Amino acid sequence: MNVSIFEDVIKDVDCYVDNILQEGFEDVQVGNDLFRNVKARGVDELVSFLNKNYPTYRPDLNFVRRSPINQEEPNWIHTDEMMGDLTAILYLSKKHPKEDGTTLYYKGEKMCIFKSRYNRLVVFPSKLYHSRNIYDNFGYAESARLIQVCFLKNNI
């Protein structure tokens, strides 16, 4: 299993986040699951970074998600296996609880805990079970948890 952590991925992250917030968010129904406060992104600075650092993969789905406190989420501990081969999560909350981040699991046990940091990117195999560290999310409106997720598929 290969896991990667990158710091300071987006050059002008404050402007990047401002643009995301200005575009707004929407709710998307996928089968029985309702994904709240998401917004699809096209080819952006994160995708360019991933293309450069993962040349044998192609970004398939790229979106941002804002998760205010007590927002119902369709999944807790889950895999993204059906979405791609790698999952990339970019933390975009400038202010966040120290517990914020992502936990990876192996055979039902916590294996690795990533701590959120503004403009930090974590990339891991999509088949791994994982969850956000704070079940109920945090913040309100512009202070809510903000992440960008991109799924990558192997070109080979």
Report each predicted region and the residues it spans:
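Non-heme Fe(II)/2-oxoglutarate
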Residues: 1-75
